[in-house]
């Protein structure tokens, strides 16, 4: 399981020309589910994401979490994080989980984030989405469990 976590001033998802979700200050998380990933791995990843201290405190040091700053969370499923371009120029996505299981874990990620008191929104699983963001910092982390 892989996640790209970006600290943002705002982020949004548009599908078929319609706004489906948007957040203000917080995290945009791109989530990639690999074959065989478990709920335990998802729990570990979400716990880590929500505990990250990547917002500045009063001295400018990265020391505050998403909850500390009252931030919001936008989670977008992105199977292309599991792409392998080590051979040739066209990536293989054979390492990505099958859609039904990936969707199940993605939806659990939304619930886990919301259950921790964080206003959480998502994209539309499997849709062609237009994701916009204003990266803050920029601060971008790649996490893998």
From Swiss-Prot:
EC class (word): hydrolase
Enzyme Commission number(s) from the entry: 3.1.1.96
Gene Ontology MF annotations: D-tyrosyl-tRNA(Tyr) deacylase activity; Gly-tRNA(Ala) deacylase activity; Ser(Gly)-tRNA(Ala) hydrolase activity; tRNA binding
Protein keywords: Cytoplasm, Hydrolase, RNA-binding, tRNA-binding
UniProt subcellular location: Cytoplasm
Catalyzed reaction equations: glycyl-tRNA(Ala) + H2O = tRNA(Ala) + glycine + H(+); a D-aminoacyl-tRNA + H2O = a tRNA + a D-alpha-amino acid + H(+)
Source superkingdom: Bacteria
Membrane-spanning residues: none
NCBIfam families: D-aminoacyl-tRNA deacylase (TIGR00256)
Entry similarity comment: Belongs to the DTD family.
Quaternary structure (record): Homodimer.
Protein name: D-aminoacyl-tRNA deacylase
Primary gene name: dtd
